Amino acid sequence: MPLGQRAGDKSESRYCGVEVLDFPAGEELPAVLSHSLSSSFDFLLAPLVDPDYRPTPGSVLPVAASDLVLGPAQWSSHIVGKINEWIDLDAEDEQLRLDSEITLKQEIAWASHLSLQACVLPPPKRSSCANYARVVNHILQGLTNLQLWLRIPLEKSEPMDEDHDGAKDNSDMSDTVDSWEWWNSFRLLCEHSSQLCVALDVLSTLPSMNSLGRWFGEPVRAAILQTNAFLTNARGYPCLSKRHQKLLTGFFNHSVQVIISGRSNHNVSQGGVLSGDENHTEDTAVRHALSPYLDYIAYIYQRMDPLPEQERFEINYRDFLQSPLQPLMDNLEAQTYETFEKDTVKYTQYQRAIAKALVDRVSDDDVSTTKTVLMVVGAGRGPLVRASLQAAEETGRKLKVYAVEKNPNAVITLHSLIKLEGWESLVTIISSDMRCWEAPEKADILVSELLGSFGDNELSPECLDGAQRFLKPDGISIPSSYTSFIEPITASKLHNDIKAHKDIAHFETAYVVKLHRIARLAPTQSVFTFDHPNPSPNASNQRYTKLKFEIPQETGSCLVHGFAGYFDAVLYKDVHLGIEPNTATPNMFSWFPIFFPLRKPIYVPSKTPIEVHFWRCCGATKVWYEWAVTAPSPSPIHNSNGRSYWVGL
């Protein structure tokens, strides 16, 4: 039974499982499953094979249960396989190593036969796990629907001794082992397989928040919450520390399922449940020993705020790679216009900026005698025309509007709007590319919405430089400036989605994407800034910058899959618009961030800065970006000469 109802959330994190610690021999598995389901758990993490089994010639695999004891849907929906923990593919003992390989392959084959969705692999037993990864990589190449979840403890622990005999090399005594490093080594050896995921063991102590944050960019499918991580409240019930609660909420928001594991450490009477937990009130006679822990997890889930309306609208776009618009080369479709026009926040900001500009342009004494000439370049279907006229009405200023639009289909709608609203005497429609049109008079105010996710990536500088000839020497441009920003991120899902194309071109393309399963590794830094009117209209719009990002020391090492890009625009004076995380305009959805991927992810050791170079290049027919990392290790220069991705003029 799901943990509860949270408006807008349909993710897998609503389901909670329980780990079966003892091998369910014979026909016990159906009873164990039935008991768990009746106690409101949704699935089992269960061993598939007797832990005492060692392969011998001619022996039959001692499985937990015949495939007939559960129906196909039960196996698929309610069982996650647990691979035997004695398996050690990097052991010095050759027989143990060979037995481990045979058994692992047999267990995975049995799980595939049962049509399980996932199996949990035991954690690496030492930091060097190359043979373990090699065997798993072989297995992954033969899988289709089965995912393998590598179990990793969520901790920074003392270094493991290679021989497990308690003796430690003195040279390593001062170091700590970051379990993220085990995962990173393993997934690199397995070539970033999209079917290799993580199951995190959540213990009683947690690393720093920055260190934890790395995992939100990784393919974490389950958080295995140990019962010894729970505290006891005043009523004797299990509860979690504030830090554990925050982590759990983060998991829920990232579609991570919780699995409760361990023995019950709380002697709670079977009669009561936590207040507000109406979904978990089954007959106490059959309740599971770990039900009090489930009740608490459900309580945490149910008290989360509903997903905001904007998040619900955007949920299907999460981590979905889209090509940026080419507004100069292509004419937008009606559906695209409609989506943008629903963003009332954006047009409210434009109206505020235009109103301030009108008041500055025309004093109260000149209101009755002065008419302001305003040009909307790239008028689309008219939302900026409407915002301009509303600003004029609000401020009591007279306005003459030129609406310039190159898309003949949008011009048809624009004519209908002007006629419907009775604006024929106020608005002149120009069906032309702004770069070709010769204006009959100069404008006091030039208004445009040519901004892309990276500010200048939809060629606003080129368009406005061409339209600047319409503007009076003391005229006002809205926007007056815009700046792009980037930050390094971990984004395993985006990397794997791009890798699936199996070519370089897709790794040299910038994508618009609603970022979700990512880890932000360092604060954003500014990249390029453009001002309008351009004080040097004949100057090139080419740009180059070099940035150095310092990752907080407590984060530890990390893997950079690329750079997230944003913009912030000054519309006029103190009215701004943007998506840069620190200053983002609330409740605006016209722009998702842009993502610049790296062909090969860059490993960044702890305390090591990242140095990145960005170029904005201009040619006769196109504009493109190039980017490269030079520290801590050099990457190729991506998209050299615009060979893979460009914006056409």
Curated annotation (Swiss-Prot):
Entry annotation: catalytic residues: 449, 458
Record keywords, A-Z: Cytoplasm, Methyltransferase, S-adenosyl-L-methionine, Transferase
Gene Ontology CC: one annotated term: nucleus
Top-level taxon: Eukaryota
Originating gene: PRMT5
Record lineage: Eukaryota, Viridiplantae, Streptophyta, Embryophyta, Tracheophyta
All copies of domain SAM-dependent MTase PRMT-type, residue ranges: 321-627
Pfam families: PRMT5, PRMT5_C, PRMT5_TIM
Residues annotated for S-adenosyl-L-methionine binding in this entry: 337, 346-347, 405, 433-434
Start and end residues of each stretch annotated as Dimerization: 491-507
Name of the molecule in the record: Protein arginine N-methyltransferase 5
Known catalytic reactions: L-arginyl-[protein] + 2 S-adenosyl-L-methionine = N(omega),N(omega)'-dimethyl-L-arginyl-[protein] + 2 S-adenosyl-L-homocysteine + 2 H(+)
InterPro entries tied to this protein: Arg_MeTrfase, Arg_MeTrfase_PRMT5, PRMT5, PRMT5_C, PRMT5_TIM, SAM-dependent_MTases_sf
Subcellular location: Cytoplasm
MF terms (GO), sorted A to Z: histone arginine N-methyltransferase activity; protein-arginine omega-N symmetric methyltransferase activity
